[in-house]
C-alpha cells in the first residue's frame, strides 16, 4: 500500500510538471501584436475577415502552438528568420496547430498572417500554448499602408493554374503584390479586400450596381458583411492608402461609367474622412485590358484631378502593366505568383518615393 501511495504521488508530480510545461496564452495577453481589422467584442475569441491579418508574438522557450476556431482556414507562419510555411485549421476538430517544437531554449519570434479570405471560414483566434513564456515582440515597422482591393489584392488563385477550379488552398495573400511590396519597403499593411467586390458594382451584378455589399458599403465596418461593429479608424492611421478596384465593376459588359465614378468618389470621401493625413493612390490593373482598361484609367484620372481641384492634393495615380500571359496565369485568369512579383517590382519604387515626399 505504501508503494502504491508513493507511486501515485510520483504520478501526480509528473502530471503537474507536464501541465506546467505548456502554458495557455490568452488572446488578451498584451505581448501579442495584432495587425489588421480585428473584432475584439469577445476578447477571448477575436474575429477577423480579411487576408493579411497578422498575429505576432515573441516567446522564451522551445515550443509554440496556435489555437483557433476549428475550420478557420489558412495562415502563413514564420519562426524567427526561417522559411515561411503554411498551416491549416481545416477539420471540425482542428483547433491546435504546432508551429515549432524542440527549438533551443531561447527567445524566438512567430509571425502569423491569414493568407486567404475569411468570409466563408469566419476565423477566430483562441490564443497560444508554449512551454516557456511570452516576451516583448519586435516593434512594427514605422511605415504603414492600407490596401483596399478585390481578388487581385487577395491573391486569388495565385498558387493555382488556369483551367482548374478555385480552392482556398491556392489563394495566398502572403505572396501577393501587396505583401511583397511591404516586405521590400520594410513597411506593414492592413488589408480590406474581397474577391469579386467593386467600387460600385460587384462581379456579374446588375448595371445599377451592388449598393448593399460593394466596397463603400463594407469599408466602414471591422468585418466583411457584418455591421455589428464600425471600424475605429484611430486604431490604424496609414501613411498611404492604395485602392485597387474597378476590374469587377467593368466586368461582363454591363456597367454604368457614371455610377462607377460616383462609387470611386464615395469611397475616396470615406477614406479621407477616416484617414485625413494619408496619401491616397488609385491603382489600376493588372487584369483589365482593351476598352475597359481605358475606361478605368480615364475615370480614375478624372476623380484624381477633381480631388486636386477641390483642394485634396494628396491623391495620386498608378497603373500596373497589364498581364499578357508571359508569366502564366493563376486560377480564372488571375495573376500568377510571377505576375504578382512583377506588380511588386513596379509598385515598390513608386511607394518608396511617395513615402519620402
Predicted regions and their residues:
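N-terminal secretory targeting modules
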Residues: 3, 9, 18-148, 152-173
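Short, conserved loop/helix-junction motifs that constitute active-site signature segments
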Residues: 140, 273-275
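Conserved SGNH/GDSL esterase-like catalytic core that processes O-acyl groups on lipids
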Residues: 52, 119, 163-262, 288-302, ...
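Structural recognition of the beta-strand scaffold that forms the well-ordered cores
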Residues: 144-148, 153, 189-193, 239-244, ...
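Short acidic/His/Gly/Ser-rich catalytic and metal-binding motifs that mark active-site loops
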Residues: 154-158, 200-202, 250-252, 325-329
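Extracellular serine-dependent O-acyl
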Residues: 279-284, 292-330, 339-357
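Proline-centered flexible-loop/turn and helix-kink motifs
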Residues: 71, 276-277
Amino acid at each position: 500500500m505504501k508503494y502504491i501511495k508513493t507511486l501515485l504521488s510520483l504520478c501526480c508530480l509528473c502530471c503537474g510538471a507536464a501541465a506546467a510545461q505548456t502554458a495557455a496564452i490568452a488572446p488578451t495577453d498584451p505581448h501579442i501584436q495584432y495587425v489588421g481589422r480585428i473584432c475584439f467584442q469577445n476578447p477571448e475569441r477575436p474575429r477577423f475577415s480579411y487576408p493579411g491579418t497578422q498575429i505576432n508574438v515573441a516567446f522564451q522557450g522551445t515550443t509554440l502552438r496556435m489555437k483557433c476556431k476549428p475550420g478557420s482556414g489558412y495562415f502563413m507562419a514564420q519562426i524567427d528568420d526561417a522559411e515561411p510555411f503554411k498551416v491549416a485549421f481545416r477539420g471540425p476538430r482542428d483547433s491546435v496547430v504546432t508551429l515549432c517544437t524542440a527549438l533551443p531554449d531561447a527567445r524566438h519570434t512567430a509571425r502569423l498572417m491569414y493568407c486567404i479570405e475569411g468570409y466563408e471560414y469566419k476565423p477566430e483566434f483562441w490564443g497560444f500554448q508554449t512551454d516557456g513564456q511570452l516576451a516583448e515582440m519586435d516593434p512594427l515597422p514605422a511605415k504603414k499602408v492600407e490596401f483596399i482591393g478585390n481578388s487581385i489584392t487577395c491573391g486569388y488563385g495565385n498558387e493555382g493554374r488556369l483551367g482548374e477550379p478555385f480552392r482556398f488552398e491556392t489563394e495566398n495573400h502572403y505572396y501577393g503584390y501587396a505583401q511583397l511590396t511591404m516586405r521590400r519597403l520594410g513597411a506593414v499593411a492592413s488589408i480590406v479586400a474581397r474577391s469579386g467586390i467593386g467600387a460600385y458594382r460587384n462581379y456579374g451584378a446588375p448595371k445599377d450596381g451592388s449598393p448593399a455589399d460593394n466596397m463603400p458599403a463594407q469599408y466602414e465596418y471591422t468585418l466583411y458583411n457584418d455591421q455589428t461593429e464600425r471600424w475605429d479608424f484611430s486604431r490604424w492611421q496609414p501613411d498611404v492608402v492604395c485602392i485597387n478596384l474597378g476590374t469587377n465593376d467593368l466586368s461582363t459588359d454591363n456597367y454604368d461609367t457614371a455610377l462607377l465614378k460616383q462609387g470611386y468618389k464615395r469611397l475616396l470621401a470615406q477614406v479621407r474622412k477616416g484617414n485625413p493625413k494619408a496619401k491616397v493612390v488609385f491603382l489600376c490593373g493588372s487584369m483589365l485590358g482593351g476598352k475597359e482598361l481605358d475606361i478605368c484609367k480615364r475615370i480614375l484620372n478624372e476623380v484624381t484631378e477633381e480631388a486636386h481641384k477641390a483642394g485634396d492634393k494628396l491623391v495620386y495615380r498608378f497603373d500596373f502593366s497589364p498581364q499578357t500571359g508571359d508569366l502564366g496565369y493563376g486560377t480564372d485568369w488571375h495573376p500568377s505568383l510571377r505576375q504578382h512579383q512583377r506588380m511588386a517590382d513596379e509598385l515598390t519604387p513608386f511607394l518608396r518615393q511617395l513615402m519620402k515626399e
